[in-house]
């Protein structure tokens, strides 16, 4: 008589016969696995990741409320590209970009055009493509060559602009960032632009430091260039972070469609738009600034759908989350949330400035992001890379990195304060920072410089 062996549910799950093995990583296993075990393997491996709430390196949102999480769970299976299949979701997408058009002072929000994207990098590339195509149209109409287009931008641009210029054969002309000119401010701009310039990029919230580039000052410089040379050069605003900060914390700042030279603005819904990744937005001042030839009308699932995107299928849930927040927070709520983040940023920067070896690069007065460097008088036994490494032992992820190419000898650390980072956590961070700084200052000899930690964004 065969004795049937019975198994009980045990914890850990891997005590069951056949499961006390190393999971296949680079190929499909021949056999199935119980869902509980597969879940536990993935769950356990991701415990080795950093804590998202203590990640002060990322701009990406890491917290939403329970209602948003419920809405997310209800809509994760919707594809944003299926506008014929999900018409109300498509209508909500349009509601969102029209809200942004009005927020950014489009002269006539009813006649503008925009779209959601997978993130602000795609949004930037779409804005850049429109600039290139309009430049090509104007050159051809004038009987001129369309060879050798260029784009002018700060040396501190986010890497998506380097990709854009590389992928679409555009010469990137970088205006240096220096200690005298901490941002691209329009100085010496006439030596960078010419008849082949498709546009100028201005950044509302530089990735390295969080500082705003003075858009009006850049626009004024381009006005002067046009008066002198006749060159009419447009601006794209990369407002990945600042586009959802400036309207609420600096409402009197002139940076958006109030300036005629601004043709398009992009932002990130998953940064200070407060949505989970990935979501971006790009809006044009008026519909005629987006060349019709770039818009595809695709027959898909029984309907004709206009689309302008680099991606095709992408989640619709984040668009619905953005609309939820627009309804939930309104101007007053967004102002409160962003002000709370900036209050924490200024509290942190003030506390760091009081610690002996540090000198602030900026204090978080633009977006809630700031950077600092070591004073010349600081100990030579350690660097900010070592401090970043020490802070990891406390659970904090704080990047250290060199400034752009024109400031190669300056290393900074940067903190991004996001929604959900409380004043209490900030106080705990300052305590840990002081503790690790004291530890490093007490070293009798220099720390090794090989294998310094790095963050890649």
Located regions from the model:
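Conserved PLP-binding active-site segment of the aspartate aminotransferase-like
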Residues: 202, 368-381, 395-430
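A common structural junction motif
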Residues: 391-399, 434-441
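N-terminal entrance/gating region of PLP-dependent enzymes' catalytic architecture
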Residues: 1-111, 395-396, 413, 433, ...
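Conserved PLP-enzyme active-site core in the AAT-like
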Residues: 4, 11, 118-296, 301-303
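PLP-dependent enzyme catalytic core of the Aspartate aminotransferase-like
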Residues: 225, 407-457
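Short Gly/Ser/Thr- and Asp/Glu-enriched loop/turn motifs at secondary-structure junctions
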Residues: 109-111, 146, 362-369, 408-410
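Short amphipathic alpha-helices in soluble, non-transmembrane regions
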Residues: 383-392, 429-434
